[in-house]
Amino acid sequence: MPLRKMKIPFLLLFFLWEAESHAASRPNIILVMADDLGIGDPGCYGNKTIRTPNIDRLASGGVKLTQHLAASPLCTPSRAAFMTGRYPVRSGMASWSRTGVFLFTASSGGLPTDEITFAKLLKDQGYSTALIGKWHLGMSCHSKTDFCHHPLHHGFNYFYGISLTNLRDCKPGEGSVFTTGFKRLVFLPLQIVGVTLLTLAALNCLGLLHVPLGVFFSLLFLAALILTLFLGFLHYFRPLNCFMMRNYEIIQQPMSYDNLTQRLTVEAAQFIQRNTETPFLLVLSYLHVHTALFSSKDFAGKSQHGVYGDAVEEMDWSVGQILNLLDELRLANDTLIYFTSDQGAHVEEVSSKGEIHGGSNGIYKGGKANNWEGGIRVPGILRWPRVIQAGQKIDEPTSNMDIFPTVAKLAGAPLPEDRIIDGRDLMPLLEGKSQRSDHEFLFHYCNAYLNAVRWHPQNSTSIWKAFFFTPNFNPVGSNGCFATHVCFCFGSYVTHHDPPLLFDISKDPRERNPLTPASEPRFYEILKVMQEAADRHTQTLPEVPDQFSWNNFLWKPWLQLCCPSTGLSCQCDREKQDKRLSR
């Protein structure tokens, strides 16, 4: 046989082998995100009283990141950064106003259609993709059926969960997250109307001023209208905003908390079982442990930390079910699993009965909605038995934005070249090929405001953190903004610092002792480098539409989703009650 003809079969065999080898090297990817879980809650991060054996098992079988940072201390912007590998301010997913998360399903704001998620990249590489649980990145733009922000328009083949978030208002008897705001928007106008009525009545009775009867009726009508709108909003909020979806269809409105974690677990397990022969991406986004807190009968009252501990332990059980399933299907060695939280624990969450409904941020100051370490330092666990050595601990600064380039590279997907990607590939750190994080600088945003800069200089163990402003805790001396339920980012809610507050996080992780020129000889030199880095960073920020503008944020009736039902109740339950997984 001529040599040229002999080469052809060998070349074909080589290319076939290369293709099969590439497919075999691409792992399944499971990204697990808790909601408002503090770094001090899991046992593997030091908690001795909440039982998290399955999260701990994940950590002992892989790598535990001790300085893993959320790109934002709030749900919506943090999740946008996680999905895109970019600071949320780059996509308009960071608010310039008081409210930094979406509160209505019928808002037009959301993750822009031109943003590229890791789900899009992996779907293009042949991965089957699913999001189970919480989305909170918007739904529709112009009509209720355009679904421009829906998970299925951002790279996911399958969606089962909630489009908004879990809120107190979603569970009867748990109060409302709007109470504080309504004190200004509702109660203050009512007080003004009431005082005006009494004053006019007194003047009229004393004969000092003649007030037509129509004025009294008008003021009474205005007060009744304000009160009616307030009560109507609270009454209809739950069915209009708290519902379960499967892909584009509402299947339960309002959603039921009965065995909700079990239902999410069943959906995740079924997705894995459907994709044992093809690579898959599963984002399992728990509703735990955001309020309203809940748990099934098997976990209620079983922990040492009330309903919060019950919820954490139920979530841990669910993680264990996924790990056990991977073992049963012999997929564990070929699956990269990542576990994290979208931000730190919400320390201001206290029930009307005085029970603590927020978690623990361990030794760290602050919590959700601020950039003290307690608000942004979150659990970060990765396991891939075939590649990552078990039992490691990495203290280098990493970000939840790093997941985007990491999974893209593992899937063989090229990174977009038409935009800045702020995340960095974690694999050199995880495989021990590098001892240093690729992040020399990280920037911490309070909504859309640049709040702080973190600098890890080369050839140094120091990790400097400079605050341009800090939240005003209330009461003074507490560890949170209890008067407003979360900390805000501007005006009288913050204190600006000139020069910035400077800490060495490597020596003072509790952020108790700000440095001074007397205690740090290079004080001004360090701040100069950090300010220059911040200036360079802000110059890379494009002008983009604000997804939290009043126009995008407010409720729009023509965008309201409602399942077909009799009357105007927006109530239905098409959810098939799957048999609960045994504990």
UniProtKB/Swiss-Prot annotation:
The modification 3-oxoalanine (Cys) is found at residue 75. It catalyses: dehydroepiandrosterone 3-sulfate + H2O = 3beta-hydroxyandrost-5-en-17-one + sulfate + H(+); estrone 3-sulfate + H2O = estrone + sulfate + H(+). Residues 209-212 are cytoplasmic. GO terms for cellular component: endoplasmic reticulum; endoplasmic reticulum lumen; endoplasmic reticulum membrane; endosome; Golgi apparatus; intracellular membrane-bounded organelle; lysosome; membrane. GO terms for molecular function: arylsulfatase activity; metal ion binding; steryl-sulfatase activity; sulfuric ester hydrolase activity. The conversion to 3-oxoalanine (also known as C-formylglycine, FGly), of a serine or cysteine residue in prokaryotes and of a cysteine residue in eukaryotes, is critical for catalytic activity. Residues 22-184, 235-583 are lumenal. Glycans are attached at residues 47, 259. Changing residue 476 to M: Does not affect steryl-sulfatase activity. The chain crosses the membrane at residues 185-208, 213-234. Residues 1-21 form the signal peptide. Its EC number is 3.1.6.2. The active site is at residues 75, 136. Ca(2+) binds at residues 35-36, 75, 342-343. Its cofactor is Ca(2+). The record marks 333, 459 as: Not glycosylated. It is found in: Cytoplasmic vesicle, Secretory vesicle, Microneme membrane; Endoplasmic reticulum membrane. It comes from the Eukaryota. CDD domains: ES (cd16159). Catalyzes the conversion of sulfated steroid precursors, such as dehydroepiandrosterone sulfate (DHEA-S) and estrone sulfate to the free steroid. Belongs to the sulfatase family. It is linked to Ichthyosis, X-linked: A keratinization disorder manifesting with mild erythroderma and generalized exfoliation of the skin within a few weeks after birth. Affected boys later develop large, polygonal, dark brown scales, especially on the neck, extremities, trunk, and buttocks. This is Steryl-sulfatase. It comes from Homo sapiens. The lineage of its organism: Eukaryota, Metazoa, Chordata, Craniata, Vertebrata.
